[in-house]
A protein has these predicted regions:
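Acidic, Ser/Thr/Gly/Pro-rich intrinsically disordered interaction regions
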Residues: 1-34, 52-159
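Extended, well-ordered alpha-helical segments in internal regulatory regions
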Residues: 42-51
């Protein structure tokens, strides 16, 4: 079964999500948040471009709450306004020398949830969607020559 480019984007998003385990703060937190949100939205763009009837396929899912209230809305806010409704806070355990960092959504449908949990939910949503596409045997557009290498695909990003 063909692997979609969108699956590589999901893999990269999982890698970026795992960086939150390093308890990022300040600049590192903001940069990683931008990366995760941009990648989550890029999955949809890749899928639309990979299929001959991409718009028709994507129309089935674009009204799902995780897409409208999180993937699209959060990406738009951070990329178009360079602001977010996610904050981080250090939480220490009383009687212990340990503390942890929580990344909490401060407004909207996901208010009070940890952004890592919602990113995970979005990743799972995309993976389920791709599984459905594979089961329905949608036809990929001939965008990728099987002889292409990763460096060939990366060339446009070097300029």
């Amino acid at each position: 079964m063909d692997k979609f480019r969108a699956e590589q984007v999901i893999s990269d998003c999982k890698l970026a999500l795992s960086r939150f385990d390093d308890e990022l703060i300040a600049d590192e937190f903001r940069l990683n948040l931008v990366l995760c949100l941009a990648l989550l939205r890029a999955v949809g763009h890749c899928l639309q471009n990979e299929f001959r009837n991409g718009d028709i396929i994507f129309n089935k899912k674009k009204n799902d709450k995780i897409f409208t209230d999180f993937i699209k809305k959060f990406r738009d806010k951070i990329l178009k306004n360079y602001s977010s409704n996610v904050g981080w806070e250090m939480v220490s355990v009383v009687g212990s020398n340990t503390c942890s960092i929580h990344y909490i959504i401060t407004e909207g449908s996901y208010k009070g949830k940890d952004i890592r949990d919602v990113i995970t939910e979005a990743i799972n949503w995309w993976e389920q969607y791709i599984l459905e596409l594979k089961q329905e045997k949608y036809t990929l557009q001939p965008l990728i020559d099987t002889e292409e290498t990763i460096s060939d695909l990366a060339q446009p990003f070097l300029y």
